[in-house]
């Protein structure tokens, strides 16, 4: 095996997460947007492996989370579908356990998890992945279709890759560079078998139905109008889509209609703003009005039901300024 020049020593860090903002902060350099979509206090764990040539992570959360965004690095993300994450919707589609999800750097990470989900992922540099799969690189990384793909390897190949990935995430800290390279190479070798065994090109499933474009466009409008009034008819008029069709697509993808999704986006952003404003002069009322919440009593009840605490508690004040 060719020796790799080390820019940084390999490392592994484990985190216990007691707040959704901890989760958001941990992955903020990735550049995605995160929303807690189920009700209750958030808790979870995360393991981040920064290796010699690859990266890996494991995230376990008790609440459902919607994630949308694009990694800024030129990395290919590979995620095994297991019993712990098979109820996750990947780009609007559920995959059965035994599949391998592959997402190239040009493709958005776009998924909706359920409660108590565990996701493990291996991130491989694009040039390295391209060398591994050869002429299949274009379709596997989504550069031809701008969508993720799923492939179903043999059961034995999949188990070996999962074991190698778990071994990588269970490495002791500090990680010895030579042992790290050995574990990484084993993981890459097992991944290569998963990707290339048999008629690989015939086992590839592209993810991303036409309805995904409509969801993307709708979410973009919501983000643009996040601090302004927005009605369902505004979205339908701009996208020239029937309200019933839009509601059905959102129900299938998120379990709720578009306007409930929009309100949840604003609720999550409000919580982020309240956390950021701790120790300052801003009040709950000021921040709530910024995101269009005018009935503060109703907001307090909805907020507590969703996050398990009052807005004033998130802001860090002993006595509420609006709910009393």
What kind of feature is each model-predicted range?
Residues 1-74, 79:
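N-terminal low-complexity or simple alpha-helical regulatory segments
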Residues 1-37, 87-226, 231-233, 237-243, ...:
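Alpha-helical bundle regulatory/interaction domains
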Residues 55-57, 63-109:
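Well-ordered mid-protein domain cores that form the structural environment of catalytic cofactors
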Residues 116, 264-267, 308:
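ATP/adenylate-binding site constellation spanning eukaryotic-like Ser/Thr protein kinases
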Residues 211-215, 262-267:
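Generic hydrophobic, amphipathic alpha-helix propensity
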Residues 246, 250, 298-299, 303:
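Short hydrophobic/aromatic patch on the recognition helix
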Residues 252-253, 305-306, 317:
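Alpha-helical DNA-recognition elements
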